[in-house]
Curated annotation (Swiss-Prot):
The keyword Lipid metabolism does not apply. SMART domains: RL11. It comes from Blochmanniella floridana. One or more lysine residues are methylated. The gene is rplK. This is Large ribosomal subunit protein uL11. CDD domains: Ribosomal_L11. The keyword RNA-binding applies. Forms part of the ribosomal stalk which helps the ribosome interact with GTP-bound translation factors. PROSITE patterns: RIBOSOMAL_L11. Pfam families: Ribosomal_L11, Ribosomal_L11_N.
């Protein structure tokens, strides 16, 4: 019989690929839970070695009562991927009034393919509609490919 470890807490962070260091926000978040920060940083950097530098990855860290941990690396956030596709640094302060850029429907589908793993959507069409809504919420216009 497999004995399950008792979970103490879950920590959600967004960390740049290959760049985990003990400095804030990682150090304080893990230190409060009694986790070996350097071990996490080494493990994270090793597992993200194949990722593009600068890619922001959501990470869910599960801390167990015996102070051991496991972590799951998710796909990059939709907002990060949309901003990268549009070539912008930040979204609009007034998204319904001011547009900060444009994305093509083909880019939306590519992002939806990436995000489909982490989404509750069952098909590409509904995932794409969700990504389109996210694009509009940060002030991006969605254009058809012509």
């Amino acid at each position: 019989m497999i004995v399950k470890k008792k979970v103490q807490s879950c920590i959600k962070l967004q960390i740049e690929a290959r760049s985990a260091t003990p400095s804030p926000p990682i150090g304080p978040a893990l230190g409060q839970q009694g986790i070996n920060i350097m071990k996490f940083c080494k493990d994270f950097n090793t597992r993200t070695a194949d990722f593009e530098m600068g890619l922001i990855l959501p990470v869910v860290i599960t801390v167990y009562v015996d102070r051991s941990f496991s972590f799951v690396i998710k796909t990059p956030t939709a907002v990060f991927l949309l901003k990268k596709a549009a070539g912008i640094k930040s979204g609009s302060e007034k998204p319904k009034c001011v547009s900060v850029g444009k994305v093509l429907i083909s880019q939306i589908y590519e992002i939806a393919k990436i995000k489909l793993i982490d989404m509750t959507s069952l098909n590409l069409e509904s995932a794409s509609k969700s990504i389109m809504g996210t694009a509009r919420s940060i002030g991006l216009e969605v254009e058809d490919n012509l």
